[in-house]
């Protein structure tokens, strides 16, 4: 029987399409601006995700000795610096394709997208829970 849940690839594509729609609206991108913006931003996102994957979760700190904690702190700040460097590089590249006002709105678009996505995920979880409860009552 086919699952009602989309696979991770389909889910990623839907999230990407939702990001494009929200950013395009919030930043008020023209077709020409969007054509220049998205390739730059997508590369930035991939690089940023790669940096974030390198960071060890802090919930492992209790099992570390002092030297490992010191190394964790050092690596954590190196990764944060790398993220900052990526963001600076992004802004330099975006200056060639977007006006400053739209670049300045990018953090707003990112925040609103994240908040909206989290809310959509919560709503979907609640709907699934309600369906399960409803299905259980019919048995």
Located regions from the model:
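Boundary of Sec targeting at the N-terminus
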Residues: 3-5
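Basic helix-turn-helix/winged-helix DNA-binding cores
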Residues: 13-14
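Amphipathic, charged alpha-helical segments and their helix-to-coil junctions
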Residues: 84-139
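Amphipathic alpha-helical segments
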Residues: 19-97
């Amino acid at each position: 029987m086919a699952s009602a849940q989309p696979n991770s690839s389909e889910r990623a594509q839907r999230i990407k399409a939702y990001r494009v729609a929200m950013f395009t609206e919030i930043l008020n991108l023209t077709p020409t601006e969007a054509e220049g913006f998205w390739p730059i931003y997508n590369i930035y996102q991939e690089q940023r995700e790669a940096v974030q994957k390198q960071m060890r979760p802090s919930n492992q700190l209790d099992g570390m000795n002092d030297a490992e904690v010191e190394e964790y702190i050092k690596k954590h700040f190196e990764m944060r610096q790398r993220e900052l460097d990526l963001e600076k590089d992004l802004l330099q590249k975006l200056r060639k394709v977007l006006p400053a006002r739209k670049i300045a709105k990018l953090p707003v678009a990112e925040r609103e997208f994240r908040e909206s996505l989290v809310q959509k995920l919560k709503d979907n979880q609640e709907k699934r829970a309600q369906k399960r409860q409803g299905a259980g009552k019919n048995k």
